[in-house]
Amino acid sequence: MKITRWTAEMSPKKEILIQLIQAEGLDYTEVEIRSGLKLTNHRTQMREFIQIIEGELIFNLSGTQFALRPGDKLELPPNTLFSYNNLKSDVCTFLSSKTI
């Protein structure tokens, strides 16, 4: 697992995040997670990337919890068990990409 935190002074723009993903040769899917929604015990089949556009997700990997915020990128290796939930009152939107 690798987390890359967004450190630029400006907030990330969706178009910029898409360009960064495409520069890596990846396709993406845009995902919206409503407030209160939870995904439990999901296992990656391939290498998976998640990059937050807006909102916040709380991830749980092997009992370790951490927050992902706008611009943050999470890289998960194949066969990784994880869960996440949106504890905020706003929708969380992220880009999901997968590769072998």
Where does each model-flagged region fall?
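Structural motif
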Residues: 56-58, 65, 81, 91
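Short histidine-centered beta-strand/loop micro-motifs
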Residues: 18-20, 38-44, 85-87
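Short, conserved beta-strand element in jelly-roll/cupin
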Residues: 33, 44-59
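Short acidic-glycine-tyrosine-enriched beta hairpin
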Residues: 63-79
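Conserved short histidine dyad/triad with adjacent acidic residue
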Residues: 14, 27-44, 78
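Ligand-binding loop in jelly-roll beta-barrel domains
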Residues: 79-100
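A short, N-terminal "cap"/entry segment at the start of jelly-roll beta-barrel domains
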Residues: 1-30
